[in-house]
């Protein structure tokens, strides 16, 4: 039988292939003939294949079943006329179509064209070309598989670029979208309907953004954003992020900051995806950023192989105590104070393993924060271990953990502050220190913690925040935040000859008067120039200030103002701070159980300002502990086996009350304060504030305070629509245009510390030497603060600080005169009342330098009025009959010349003159004042 079948032709009617069966299931000899084999060889093959005679063992095992391919299987296809009869009921072979064959073919082609058009419309509606995928499992949207004649659009079955022609039912853009040679190819920008379909999320958002076509869509939009975005207020039309990329490269950084508010304005849907599914979206954005940056700067990849995208200005600011399960795997923004910081540890990023049995190197395996790498078996020897990490070929990344606690001002009354752990990676390492208040933008994730399960008795996941962007609240006006427009504005402002007076007026504008304190605080905030002679002898450049005076003279308010305005200002009180609280403490870390150092207020204020209120209430032991910090600006520690030195390079501004509550000018300075000479000599400026009863000054002060309260009300006065960003905290700012906005003052202060380093000249040094020698001679006669060498250094520091206010790189005579004036005011204010007058006469040419002459002339005029009253009382025995008191202008001019004041016209037109109820009579050359208004 086999030989007969093998002799038949494949096309014979009796062959299975002619009957329409699949010849792959038949023996080779029955499906096709080979010209290379003879009949004997073919028969031999047939004997082995077709004549399959089973063994007896197989018959016993397979008793059931039938061999379909036996010797007689072809009999199933023989012709049987009696059985090959079909019913004719219901079957009509007649054709009613009267068309000819040609017309029928034309109609068939037209019907096929209609079907093709219908399928294209359905495909565009349900699944646009942008989402076509050859590997899609959705049969509802699978293109039609009916075999129709498809004519290629171009010759040779392809396009000019050499791409293969489209398969039937699949458009050419579909093939280009699934081409894996280019991850992110640009699509048709005019395909609005396809872009609309990209926002129709199918399934969960995380799964949606991980699809290849969606990743390509996000990459395209983000690349366009980086290369085309222009700020609305940018008149030059500069591309914002190209400029930021150039600044990032020039600063040798690897983090590109993206403003979320700008991004959501251009691409709102993708920005929402970034907030709700940040991990996959950030991966795409970082890949695009690397490609864009390395295209603009090809050699930068030799410096940084990885670019990180940092998201700034996330609009939602969550509280730590309000974070819930709904925030998991989303981007959040929280704030708090850093309470603990771990060391820097290496974390696996790209790991390779060695098989201990065969020595094969397995990997690389990529480790991330969301999954753990586990090797199942060796690909070489198929063993299941053991495996060891290949240290040489494994790549690590930096890892650090912070613990932040809710800020004291945000904790509800009666509640304990909550805390949360923050993970820092890569270039975010050491971006914050304990004690600093920071804001963290990151991904809220969870990890398995076995200790929590053991403690709670049921499965619990520990939650952490993987930081993406960290900013300090004190660094809002740091160097990289100063734009070119800010720098230009600051440089123009420094050309104002009255810039120092404007800065002093801008210090605590809500506090009336106290020009000497405001001048001292301004000098301390700008600071002098630090010197380190050949790395052996270091001289501090920070200026220390002590405010000593009666209660109610706004000493604490000045400190609070400096805390908000100064850079890295730390506020503490003398009674609430111990010695270790000011310097440093040694304690055991609760995690590692090792002795660690925790810095105090002076350490946390490094390169800033430390503010100490109630300085006189400190214990003597605690006060002695800051001696080293105030002069050498370092803190030495030798405790628990830790011998080290911490940096405390900061200005100290302290406030204290005199003995008995009020300052008595009839007593010496040592009798008024309980501070020793070693601590007093470390203060560069001493400001003695006395609450003196003066009806004119008191009336002006009362008017200022009342107006300040009235105009600060939500619906009171004319300041209802005032801008709070101007930082004007009182009524003085509304009438005085010379007061600088507080934001501008902060930027001016930052700019001066970054770019201005003044130097002292030889002529100025000689002048300082002369004044110092005279002060030493006068201090031996008085009972105030003794003048030491430190005060000479203080004058140098104040000269440099005054030069910084003008943004000058050198010290001029004007700066030296200002420093001498401030030091003389400080020295004279500590003397007894009788000695003060003598010293003012001796140094009056320095004391009156650049002082507000109006207040000085007002004091001189009041003295002349008092003398006139006394003279009239002596002559006539009584002054009750005088309606007004008159003083000659010549007498005031004579007094003013003693203080080198020649022009009195500004004083006569000032508000101080009019508010004191004085009237000017030019015709008679007299100054009149009603006697009934004289209360001094």
Swiss-Prot record:
Gene: MCM2
UniProt-recorded name of the protein: DNA replication licensing factor MCM2
Pfam family of the protein (one): MCM_N
Keywords in alphabetical order: ATP-binding, Cell cycle, DNA replication, DNA-binding, Helicase, Host-virus interaction, Hydrolase, Metal-binding, Nucleotide-binding, Nucleus, Zinc, Zinc-finger
EC number: 3.6.4.12
Biased segments, Polar residues type: 20-36
Annotated MCM domain residues: 499-705
Stated family: Belongs to the MCM family.
SMART domains: MCM (SM00350)
Species per Swiss-Prot/TrEMBL record: Arabidopsis thaliana (Mouse-ear cress)
Region (Disordered): 1-105, 126-190, 711-739
SUPFAM superfamilies noted in UniProt: Nucleic acid-binding proteins, P-loop containing nucleoside triphosphate hydrolases
Chain location of the short sequence motif Arginine finger per the record: 681-684
Catalytic activity: ATP + H2O = ADP + phosphate + H(+)
BP-aspect Gene Ontology terms: cell cycle DNA replication; DNA replication initiation; embryo development ending in seed dormancy; regulation of cell population proliferation; regulation of root meristem growth; root development
A single cellular component GO annotation: MCM complex
Protein's cellular compartments: Nucleus
First and last residues of each zinc finger (C4-type): 355-381
GO molecular function per UniProt: ATP binding; ATP hydrolysis activity; DNA binding; helicase activity; zinc ion binding
Note from the entry: Over-expression of MCM2 strongly reduces plant and cell sizes and inhibits endoreduplication.
């Amino acid at each position: 039988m086999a030989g007969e079948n093998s002799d038949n032709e494949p096309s014979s009617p009796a062959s299975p292939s002619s009957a329409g069966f699949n010849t792959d299931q038949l023996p080779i000899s029955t499906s096709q003939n080979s010209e290379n084999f003879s009949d004997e060889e073919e028969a031999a093959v047939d004997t082995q294949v077709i004549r399959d005679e089973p063994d007896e063992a197989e018959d016993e095992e397979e008793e059931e079943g039938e061999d379909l391919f036996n010797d007689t299987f072809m009999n199933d296809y023989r012709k049987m006329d009696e059985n090959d009869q079909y019913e004719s009921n219901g079957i009509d072979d007649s054709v009613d179509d009267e068309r000819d064959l040609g017309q029928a073919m034309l109609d068939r082609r037209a019907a096929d064209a209609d079907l093709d058009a219908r399928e294209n419309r359905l495909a565009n509606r349900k699944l646009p070309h942008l989402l076509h995928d050859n590997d899609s499992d959705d049969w509802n949207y699978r293109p039609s598989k009916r075999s129709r004649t498809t004519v290629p659009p171009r010759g040779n079955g392809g396009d000019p670029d050499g791409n293969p022609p489209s398969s039937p039912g699949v458009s050419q853009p579909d093939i280009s979208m699934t081409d894996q040679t280019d991850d992110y190819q640009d699509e048709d920008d005019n395909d609005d309907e396809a872009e609309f379909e990209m926002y129709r999320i199918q399934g969960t958002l995380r799964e949606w953004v991980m699809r290849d076509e969606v990743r390509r869509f996000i990459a395209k939009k983000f690349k366009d954003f980086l290369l085309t975005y222009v700020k609305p207020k940018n008149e030059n039309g500069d591309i914002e992020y190209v400029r930021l990329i150039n600044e990032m490269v020039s600063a040798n950084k690897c983090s590109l900051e993206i403003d979320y508010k700008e991004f959501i304005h251009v691409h709102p849907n993708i920005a929402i995806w970034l907030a709700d599914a940040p991990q996959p979206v950030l991966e795409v954005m970082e890949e695009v950023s690397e490609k864009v940056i390395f295209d603009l700067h090809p050699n930068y990849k030799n410096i940084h192989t990885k670019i990180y995208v940092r998201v700034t200005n996330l609009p939602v600011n969550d509280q730590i105590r309000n974070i819930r399960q709904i925030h998991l795997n989303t981007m959040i923004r929280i704030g708090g104070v850093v309470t603990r910081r771990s060391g820097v540890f290496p974390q696996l990023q790209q790991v390779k393993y060695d098989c201990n049995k065969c020595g094969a190197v397995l990997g690389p395996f990529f480790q991330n924060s969301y999954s753990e790498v586990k090797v199942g078996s060796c690909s070489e020897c198929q063993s299941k271990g053991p495996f060891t990490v290949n240290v040489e070929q494994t790549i690590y990344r930096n890892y650090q953990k912070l613990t932040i606690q809710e800020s004291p001002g945000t904790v509800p009354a009666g509640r304990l502050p909550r805390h949360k752990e923050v993970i820092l990676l890569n270039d975010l390492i050491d971006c914050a220190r304990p004690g600093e208040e920071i804001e963290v933008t990151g991904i809220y994730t969870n990890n398995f913690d076995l200790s929590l399960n053991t403690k709670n008795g049921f499965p619990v996941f520990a939650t952490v925040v993987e930081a993406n962007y960290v900013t300090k609240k004190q660094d809002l006006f740091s160097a990289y935040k100063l734009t070119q427009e800010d720098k230009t504005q600051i440089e123009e402002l420094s050309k104002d000859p009255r810039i120092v007076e404007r800065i002093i007026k801008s210090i605590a504008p809500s506090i009336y008067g106290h020009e000497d304190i405001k001048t001292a605080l301004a000098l301390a905030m700008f600071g002098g120039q630090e010197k380190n002679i050949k790395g052996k002898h270091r001289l501090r450049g920070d200026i220390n200030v002590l405010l000593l005076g009666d209660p109610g003279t706004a000493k604490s308010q000045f400190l609070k103002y400096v805390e908000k305005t100064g850079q890295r200002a730390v506020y503490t009180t003398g009674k609430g701070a111990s010695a270790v609280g000011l310097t440093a403490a040694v304690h055991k870390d609760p995690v590692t159980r090792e002795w660690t150092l925790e810095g105090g207020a002076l350490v946390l204020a490094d390169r800033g300002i430390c503010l100490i209120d109630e300085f006189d209430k400190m214990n003597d032991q605690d006060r002695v502990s800051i001696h080293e910090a105030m002069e050498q600006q370092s803190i030495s520690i030798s405790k628990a086996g830790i011998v080290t030195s911490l940096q405390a390079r900061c200005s100290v501004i302290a406030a204290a009350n005199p003995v008995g509550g009020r300052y008595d000018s009839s007593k010496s300075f040592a009798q008024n304060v309980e501070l020793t000479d070693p601590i007093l000599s470390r203060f560069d400026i001493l400001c003695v504030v006395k609450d003196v009863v003066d009806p004119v000054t008191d009336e002006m002060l009362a008017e200022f305070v009342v107006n300040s309260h009235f105009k600060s009300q939500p619906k009171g006065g004319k300041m209802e629509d005032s801008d709070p960003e101007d930082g004007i905290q009182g009524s003085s700012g509304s009438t005085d245009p010379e007061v600088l906005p507080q934001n501008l003052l902060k930027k001016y202060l930052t700019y001066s510390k970054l770019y201005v380093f003044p130097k002292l000249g030889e002529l100025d040094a000689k002048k300082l030497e002369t004044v110092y020698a005279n002060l030493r001679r006068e201090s031996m006669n008085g009972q105030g603060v003794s003048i030491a060498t430190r005060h000479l250094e203080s004058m140098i520091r104040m000269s440099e600080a005054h030069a910084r206010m003008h943004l000058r790189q050198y010290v001029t005579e004007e700066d030296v005169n200002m420093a001498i004036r401030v030091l003389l005011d400080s020295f004279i204010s500590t003397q007894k009342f009788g000695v003060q007058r003598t010293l003012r006469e001796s140094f009056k040419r320095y004391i009156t330098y650049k002082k507000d002459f109006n207040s000085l002339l007002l004091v001189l005029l009041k003295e002349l009025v008092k003398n006139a009253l006394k003279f009239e009382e002596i002559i006539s025995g009584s002054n009750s009959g005088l309606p007004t008191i008159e003083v000659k202008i010549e007498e005031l001019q004579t007094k003013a010349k003693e203080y080198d004041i020649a022009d009195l016209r500004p004083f006569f037109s000032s508000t101080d003159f009019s508010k004191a109820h004085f009237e000017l009579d030019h015709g008679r050359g007299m100054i009149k004042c009603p006697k009934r208004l004289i209360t001094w």
